[in-house]
Amino acid sequence: MFEIHPVKKVSVVIPVYNEQESLPELIRRTTTACESLGKEYEILLIDDGSSDNSAHMLVEASQAENSHIVSILLNRNYGQHSAIMAGFSHVTGDLIITLDADLQNPPEEIPRLVAKADEGYDVVGTVRQNRQDSWFRKTASKMINRLIQRTTGKAMGDYGCMLRAYRRHIVDAMLHCHERSTFIPILANIFARRAIEIPVHHAEREFGESKYSFMRLINLMYDLVTCLTTTPLRMLSLLGSIIAIGGFSIAVLLVILRLTFGPQWAAEGVFMLFAVLFTFIGAQFIGMGLLGEYIGRIYTDVRARPRYFVQQVIRPSSKENE
């Protein structure tokens, strides 16, 4: 029987990218939610290379009187999950909660996650109820969730929702993983002994626009396929075997037909030969592209470059920059 340790301090990690309109409300509501916990807390806001006034607003928030905000400024945009990992490396709490800055997932749900974690869960996930996203975003999210469930075997309902709670030992385990392509909810479930999901509200986006464009969603799909499993490589081998057997069968058939109907028929079968040839060429290019994705990720990981660079950290207890 494992001993369940009560949560003493909560760290809220929020990546920020061009969210100057939502920041004042985000800080106010998140602070209010954390105050209601009756526990120690800190709010880590990571500026992911914003081009608007977000970084300056974060610095001011950290330097305000009685502030609980830690501002982490990255030198450029590294992506949502890399920014969250940067926040993980600076947390001091024993329960870490991640939250998006767009306020579509209400900060008021934080106490519910803390209460569920106090029951002994390593990871507390969430499922968005009555999603207020476009049809395209909903469809893409369903496809990604199904892909993850098939490749990992983990029956979690909503991997795309970043409102989640992680015990400190789960975060420490994730920080020991150095691959560049990181999808935090999946990585956390690899190390979690006990995980659960709870339903949460989902609101319309009041400020700005979603940072996930069509191309970024496509890139996310590639990341998930190549960083989660080697199943596509096995499928590629199976496909190659099927094509090879099919090609050999067609070759035997063509020889038989030529012997049966004579060389005149063979001339009339030129277009079929071209069709078969182009099928093989297309399959080869698909295989080469897939192998290239894996090799490219191996090359990126072997170089061992840092996944982010922290330019500055501003803590409320000290006005000095780290």
From Swiss-Prot:
Membrane-spanning residues: 236-256, 270-290
Primary location recorded for the protein, binned into one broad class: membrane
Stretches of the chain found on the membrane's Cytoplasmic side: 1-235, 291-322
UniProt keyword list: Antibiotic resistance, Cell inner membrane, Cell membrane, Glycosyltransferase, Lipid A biosynthesis, Lipid biosynthesis, Lipid metabolism, Lipopolysaccharide biosynthesis, Membrane, Transferase, Transmembrane, Transmembrane helix
Location of the protein in the cell: Cell inner membrane
Topological relation to the membrane, as annotated: Multi-pass membrane protein
Keyword Membrane: yes
GO molecular function annotation: phosphotransferase activity, for other substituted phosphate groups; undecaprenyl-phosphate 4-deoxy-4-formamido-L-arabinose transferase activity
Keyword DNA damage found: no
Periplasmic topological domain residue ranges: 257-269
Catalysed transformations (reactions): UDP-4-deoxy-4-formamido-beta-L-arabinose + di-trans,octa-cis-undecaprenyl phosphate = 4-deoxy-4-formamido-alpha-L-arabinopyranosyl di-trans,octa-cis-undecaprenyl phosphate + UDP
One GO term (biological process): lipopolysaccharide biosynthetic process
CDD domains the record matches: DPM1_like_bac
EC number(s) from the headed UniProt entry: 2.4.2.53
Domain of life: Bacteria
Protein function: Catalyzes the transfer of 4-deoxy-4-formamido-L-arabinose from UDP to undecaprenyl phosphate. The modified arabinose is attached to lipid A and is required for resistance to polymyxin and cationic antimicrobial peptides.
Membership in a protein family: Belongs to the glycosyltransferase 2 family.
Entries under HAMAP family matching the protein: ArnC_transfer (MF_01164)
NCBIfam families: PRK10714.1
Protein's recorded name: Undecaprenyl-phosphate 4-deoxy-4-formamido-L-arabinose transferase
The species this protein was found in: Escherichia coli (strain K12)
Lineage: Bacteria, Pseudomonadati, Pseudomonadota, Gammaproteobacteria, Enterobacterales
